[in-house]
Amino acid sequence: MKQKILLLSFLFLSLIGHAQPIDWNKKLPADPNVLIGITYYLRHNEEPKDRASFFIIRNAGALLENDDQDGLAHFLEHMAFNGSKNFPGNSMISTLERHGISFGGNLNAYTVYNISDVPMADESLTDTCLLILHDWSYYLTLDPKDIDEERGVITEEWRTRNTSATRIYNQKRPILYKGSKYAERDVIGNLDVIRTFKPETLRDFYHKWYRTDLEAIAIVGDFDIKNMEGKIKKVFSSIPVIPNPEPRPFFEIPSHDKTYFCLATDKEATSSNVQVIRIFRDKEYDGKGYATYQDVKNGLMIGFYNSMVGERIGEIIQRGQAPYVK
């Protein structure tokens, strides 16, 4: 880890020393292609050879839920594998597994739905992966029977996640995100909502926020860019653009002058933990990522700082001179 940090630092400083002077306040260049409301990113990378990864990235999630929808963004992640326009039932999983793409390994969903390490020699498999992204974008079936079956799956997931670490985090969350909607959402959601919501509530949430102007397609790997771009235009041009969509709200964690603190305990906790958390705020951050070159520099420097502190604490532990173990 130390070698990687030093290498990154050297490269970054070398660029500063040998390149033209950098205008740190300059806006970062936009680099998307936009097709009928869908943003897509294509990058050629020869390693690993003849392989690629396919992503659909959502700018939507739990923060957009109303109280009666608490947990539905996470629920939709599960439903992505329970039937769509071109892949009824569990056929999406079985189709990919025939090609060695495993569910949970190469096939996943969170804010980003992805299929990774796809062999590119088989042209039909490429077309299949694009069709899956197409269905994820707008065409999930959301069958009431499948929804009811998934309620139990998510209830069990909640039970297995209900550890001392989770309970301690839930005590800290109102302090960490005080005054923000982040304090109100824990992604997996409210079990009462999960058990009782109506299927149309899930469909309404899906079609309101999971739409083309709030998503992007990203494909990275060893393939011909022009050929892939043509395939994307052919597959995704049929997805309708939502007229007059509701603007996507963004949520900030309010600044505060005084230091907040929290003492969180749980009877099943097996160790004690002390954390110091700082919020670094980019001046022009708009909720969409880094805005300027200075933002990128700040992000790198914060990362270097955190890594250096971790390395030094680790060295103290190795020498047996610390009252802590990690």
Describe every region a protein language model picked out.
Residues 46, 246-312:
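His/Glu-based metal-binding/catalytic segments typifying zinc-dependent metallopeptidases
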Residues 27-29, 35-37, 49-53, 57, ...:
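Extracytoplasmic
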Residues 21, 216-273:
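An aromatic/glycine/proline-enriched structural segment found at the starts
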Residues 62, 100-102, 277, 306-326:
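A structural supersecondary motif
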Residues 10-18:
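Hydrophobic h-region of N-terminal signal peptides that target proteins for export
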Residues 47-95, 276, 287-309:
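Active/ligand-binding-proximal structured segments within catalytic/core domains
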Residues 58-168, 181, 185, 193-196, ...:
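Active-site-adjacent, His/Asp/Glu-enriched structural segments that form or flank metal-binding
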Residues 21-33, 113, 123, 171-215, ...:
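Histidine-acidic residue clusters that define the catalytic metal-binding segment
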